[in-house]
């Protein structure tokens, strides 16, 4: 009898143990499910907070447009100060966000950068050739580059794009690039003396100095559209303040040697000097385009970015940055900067501007323990500032 009771007790204990184990598993699963639900809720709220930051940027840029000074963009503008470069916390009840607005024209546009400019960036010769091959329609690869033949031979084959980049992440698909090579400083690149490093001598990451969308309006400081040097008459140029003999020489050069492809070549016409070059730079362009892609804003670019321009020595770039506390309203004002003479202007004028129409809004939304980082590309057009695209970003700090 005792043995039977003992056996029953053992069975009961086994059943109880199984029930306790089952309840523990159920409780654990419930905790995991509840935690997952909380995380999903926080993810949604963090993204909404980040999107609120983008809307705040749109409102700020609308004020910038309404002020009517869009031909000039500076680091002293309200849009540039907003968010204190990501240091200020904006609270939305239980959630928050930090934000920074960056001038797209303060960075190097990898869709328009020339080979000479790329050679002054932290890139290997293989990366330069491969980048140019990826974005160009030509089917023949450069010496260290790659086209379809290379990409089709990979374990997971694909074709070369043969057109412009749509995101910086796309660089990872290009021969010679990895995620580390794009988003972290490179250590295996040989640099010339022209390269300016960071404040502590560090080599910049490609993503820190690059952009895929940048453009600026093609108007003078007075807001008037620039004349097309390839179609304007000498009289029209004279009406814009260009000396008659220079206007005549420009037309003669155009008629005998063909149209101008660079404004820098206009500055090389016989008779042009530092005094009369100002009227040319501020009033003429090589086409009738109202906007130009890829130019660098002298009012917002860093010394490092400016130094990537062929013809721009580091000391001149440093002098330009030193002038940024007083806005450059027109490119002709650069001639007053020490070291920036006519020769430098001839080499760089086609790649410089004083304003921008593209802004990058970097926002980190926070809800509980969850962060969501977004980057929005905003474009100013005839209707005002608009969102071109929004991307999820890997950064946790601005």
How would you name each of these model-derived features?
Residues 2-398:
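Compositionally biased linear targeting/interaction segments
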